[in-house]
């Protein structure tokens, strides 16, 4: 390995390096450094051999040196300890050995902690995650900041490690802490374009409205650095992910965030996506990311998923636990259900006036909910196509569905008008029948008002859908 590369490994996390080119890690000094010790060495030579063993990852030689009496917390040039160097290159086995030998996990030099060194290490997220977990298990402080007031979670966010971020927060790291420039972990993730870290931080309760010292929010920082998709996502008025995990205990959070860690390949595929679709957003918000590949393999869209029956869930390999999460989410979204199974009873003329009136009231209320839903969609729908965050199918698909909706509403309006005319006819016949006791005027007036209100509501819903159709066609 080249000397330059070794010097790069020895630079402190966060870019706080020394002015000198000599970092105290000479490489070609002793041939026997890579071999087992053949006899007692002078203290200075032991230190050099120790450094060589650390940089080459020679665990057996490190153990032999420690057995010979060298301190596990030996201070090398610039005050770094062996554990700090091992953490900075994400050598999990070496970190484990040094900790087991009593190395101080809370050591810091010029406010550069071992945990910060691990979070800014050059290695895979799996290696870094294990190193951080080992250090946290030895009571390393997740909130101790460096000279620039950057905490470990900020380094993990800046370097694009969502699982490391989650682990730190689960151990008490302040997700909204700010550095000397007012940057939070979310700001750093937005600045570097780490979308998967942004989503994880929002789940953990990161405040997207915190401003930097120059008055910029994370979304504005993302826009300035040309991360348009992150800017669009952070600019949304409502965020279904925000604070989703805040109320969990530390153990629950660790379990929730790391249960899928065993499937490394799937996690990597998911975390390296280029754009979220509506299905992915829905699953991610429920913590069901592991279902993404399964549903895509079966060509199941979000619309199909939301309309599945219970037998279809099982048929498509969706477990009972996952079914419960999806059904619970649907229950929160659904409006008051009308029992349309009662409709055939109307034809038998056995239904009471109160029951029929109740049915009409429910129908009117349902139409009102639908009108409100469409109005909300029209309000939230982006005016410009570049503001759309999710992957959308061709607008023609949406337009055709809207046309179908308008047609259905027109049919519904026509049927309600027929129903109104029929009831009016029955009412007139009853009023003219001498054998019938006249109805109380107030009740008759009230029934008439209900029918009129229902008809007007249905017509209004049709008008709203028509406007929605025109809006989509213009886009």
Swiss-Prot record:
It comes from the Eukaryota. ANK repeats lie at residues 45-74, 78-107, 110-144, 148-177, 181-210, 214-243. The gene is ASZ1. This is Ankyrin repeat, SAM and basic leucine zipper domain-containing protein 1. Interacts with DDX4, PIWIL1, RANBP9 and TDRD1. Residues 272-334 form the SAM domain. It holds the Pfam family Ank_2. It comes from Atelerix albiventris (Middle-African hedgehog). The modification Phosphoserine is found at residues 17-18, 20. GO terms for cellular component: pi-body. Transmembrane segments: none annotated. InterPro entries: Ankyrin_rpt (IPR002110), Ankyrin_rpt-contain_sf (IPR036770), Asz1_SAM (IPR042650), SAM (IPR001660), SAM/pointed_sf (IPR013761). It is found in: Cytoplasm. Keywords: ANK repeat, Cytoplasm, Developmental protein, Differentiation, Meiosis, Phosphoprotein, Repeat, RNA-mediated gene silencing, Spermatogenesis. Signal peptide: none annotated. The keyword Transferase does not apply.
């Amino acid at each position: 390995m080249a000397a330059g590369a070794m010097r790069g490994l020895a630079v402190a996390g966060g870019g706080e390096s020394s002015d000198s080119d000599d970092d105290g890690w000479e490489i070609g000094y002793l041939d026997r450094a890579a071999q087992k010790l053949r006899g007692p060495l002078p203290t200075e030579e032991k230190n050099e051999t120790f450094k060589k063993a650390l940089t080459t990852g020679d665990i057996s030689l490190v153990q032999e040196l420690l057995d010979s009496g060298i301190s596990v917390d030996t201070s090398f040039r610039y005050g770094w300890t062996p554990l700090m160097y091992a953490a900075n290159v994400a050598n999990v086995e070496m970190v484990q050995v040094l900790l087991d030998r009593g190395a101080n996990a809370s050591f810091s030099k010029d406010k550069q902690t071992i945990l910060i060194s691990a979070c800014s290490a050059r290695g895979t997220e799996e290696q870094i995650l294990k190193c951080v977990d080992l250090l946290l298990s030895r009571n390393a402080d997740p909130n101790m900041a460096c000279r620039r007031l950057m905490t470990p979670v900020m380094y993990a966010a800046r370097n694009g490690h969502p699982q490391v971020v989650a682990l730190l927060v689960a151990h008490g790291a302040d997700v909204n802490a700010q550095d000397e420039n007012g940057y939070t972990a979310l700001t750093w993730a937005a600045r570097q374009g780490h979308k998967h870290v942004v989503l994880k931080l929002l789940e953990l309760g990161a405040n997207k409205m915190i401003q930097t010292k120059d008055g910029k929010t994370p979304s504005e920082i993302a826009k300035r650095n040309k991360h348009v998709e992150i800017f669009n996502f952070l600019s949304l008025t409502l965020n279904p992910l925000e604070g989703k995990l805040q109320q969990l205990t530390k153990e629950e959070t660790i379990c929730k965030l790391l249960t899928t860690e065993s499937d490394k390949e799937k996690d990597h595929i998911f975390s390296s996506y280029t754009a979220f679709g509506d299905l992915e957003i829905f699953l991610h918000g429920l913590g069901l990311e592991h279902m993404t590949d399964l549903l895509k393999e079966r060509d199941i869209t979000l619309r199909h998923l939301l309309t599945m029956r219970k037998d279809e869930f099982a048929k498509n390999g969706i477990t009972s636990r996952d079914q419960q999460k999806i059904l619970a989410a649907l229950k929160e979204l659904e409006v008051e259900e009308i029992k349309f199974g009662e409709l055939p009873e109307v034809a038998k003329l056995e239904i009471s006036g109160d029951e029929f009136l109740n049915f009409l009231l429910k129908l009117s209320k349902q139409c009102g909910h639908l009108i409100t839903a469409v109005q909300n969609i029209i309000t939230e729908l982006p005016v410009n196509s570049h503001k759309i965050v999710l992957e959308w199918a061709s607008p023609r698909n949406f337009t055709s569905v809207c046309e179908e909706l308008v047609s259905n509403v027109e049919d519904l309006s026509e049927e309600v008008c027929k129903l109104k005319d029929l009831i009016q006819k029955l009412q007139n016949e009853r009023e003219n029948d001498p054998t019938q006791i006249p109805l109380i005027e107030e009740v008759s007036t009230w029934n008439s008002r209900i029918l009129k209100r229902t008809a007007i509501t249905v017509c209004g819903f049709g008008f709203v859908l028509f406007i929605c159709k025109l809006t989509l066609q213009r886009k």
